[in-house]
C-alpha cells in the first residue's frame, strides 16, 4: 500500500523561528531541513536502520 503524508505550516513572520519537531510512529521530522526530503518506511517490521 502507498501512504503519503504532507505537513504544512504557516509562513513565518520576520524574526520568528519554528521551535518544534513533528513525529509519527518511529519517524521523526526535524525542522532543520532546508529542502524537500522523501522519507520511506513500510513501518512493519520496525527497522531502526531506516531511522534518520
From Swiss-Prot:
Main location: secreted
Cell compartment(s), UniProt: Secreted, Extracellular space, Extracellular matrix
GO CC list: extracellular space
Keyword field: Calcium, Cell adhesion, Developmental protein, Extracellular matrix, Hydrolase, Metal-binding, Protease, Secreted, Serine protease, Zinc
InterPro entries: Reelin
Post-translational modification (record): N-glycosylated and to a lesser extent also O-glycosylated.
EC numbers: 3.4.21.-
BP GO terms, sorted: cell adhesion; layer formation in cerebral cortex; neuron migration; proteolysis; reelin-mediated signaling pathway
One GO MF term attached to the UniProt entry: lipoprotein particle receptor binding
Enzyme class: hydrolase
Family (UniProt): Belongs to the reelin family.
Free-text comment on this protein's domains from its UniProt entry: The basic C-terminal region is essential for secretion.
Function, as annotated: Extracellular matrix serine protease secreted by pioneer neurons that plays a role in layering of neurons in the cerebral cortex and cerebellum by coordinating cell positioning during neurodevelopment. Regulates microtubule function in neurons and neuronal migration. Binding to the extracellular domains of lipoprotein receptors VLDLR and LRP8/APOER2 induces tyrosine phosphorylation of DAB1 and modulation of TAU phosphorylation. Affects migration of sympathetic preganglionic neurons in the spinal cord, where it seems to act as a barrier to neuronal migration.
Subunit organization: Oligomer of disulfide-linked homodimers.
Official protein name in the record: Reelin
Origin species: Bos taurus
Amino acid at each position: 500500500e502507498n501512504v503519503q503524508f504532507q505537513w504544512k505550516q504557516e509562513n513565518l513572520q520576520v524574526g520568528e523561528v519554528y521551535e518544534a519537531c513533528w513525529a509519527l510512529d518511529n519517524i521523526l521530522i526535524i525542522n532543520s531541513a532546508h529542502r524537500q526530503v522523501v522519507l520511506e518506511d513500510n513501518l512493519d517490521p520496525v527497522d531502526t536502520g531506516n531511522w534518520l
